[in-house]
């Protein structure tokens, strides 16, 4: 599955930082949870802008010490003409190195002396530097420099609540853009020719019709998240009869111990919990919400046997790292796939194949439009199907 093209999102980002949509040029800040495709959007933008005019920086990977960060972004720079002496070459100390990094972001120029474009992936990870002497306001300093810089920037992060808090008093130049789920059309465009082949019919016709059927189902199961969609699509192409795709069985396989979706969910779960406070209590709340979503603070407190005051603190810490969301004072998982993973894997023993099949069955039915599972369970069809679909949602048991 190729990097998905997201035309509407890409146009919005490009229009924001070049000012073509009216008004002053802005700095897009892309917000999205695990697997929503923030990185793939930045890599697509680099291709569209040109590798000589844009630098992608994976902040999460290179934010070690300020000195090494500066050396890393300089070494990978596609730009010419920035003066190393002005950027603090040989200057001792973390503060000097960080100031030199900010100066580089401000003064580097693209070929022809045009503005350089910096694509900063997981920019909040620069907060790592705040443990060094003299660097207590790293993110505020970054925002101040970017606001007045003559270059162009696109920022991403997986932490929505923290970003809103950081930018609350920032200049209006920053434009927050949530990364929307992939549409069925965007998923369909990434499917390889043989990935959606159905059981009968000519190869070309069936490939086209198969992709039309497969893309919406993959989108529903994956919650529109590119990483889940890619894993489901790649696995399903190898599991169906005679090459036919079976995304439901693929999801069951991927959620087993060692499966790629299981591994991705475990990473997201542990990463976010370790960035929050109250590790054990927060895990307990996630267990409660995995059993039943849409609970109020009082209902969660009763299940935890904790006071409403302490439970409110725990919930705020989970919201701070975007593991849960609150709608009308009722709490749910931000990522439905992560909830499914918690139901399966946060237990005394690893899940059996029967456990996985049962939970995946319930998960898929809950995400389908209400009419489809009802008709399927009743054995009713409005019209005779033109062809058999390879996924047997009701027959997983």
Regions inferred by a protein language model and the residue ranges of each:
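Winged-helix-like regulatory helical subdomains adjacent to P-loop NTPase cores
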Residues: 230-306, 355-360
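Conserved Walker B catalytic segment
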Residues: 96-161, 165-169
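Short, amphipathic alpha-helical interaction segments positioned at domain boundaries
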Residues: 338-367
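Conserved NTP-binding/hydrolysis module of P-loop NTPases
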Residues: 54, 64-88
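Short amphipathic alpha-helical interaction segments
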Residues: 305-320
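Conserved small helical "lid"/interfacial subdomain of P-loop NTPases
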Residues: 179-213, 221-224, 232
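A short hydrophobic beta-strand->loop->alpha-helix junction that borders the nucleotide-binding pocket
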Residues: 31, 55-64
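Walker A/P-loop nucleotide-binding motif
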Residues: 24-43
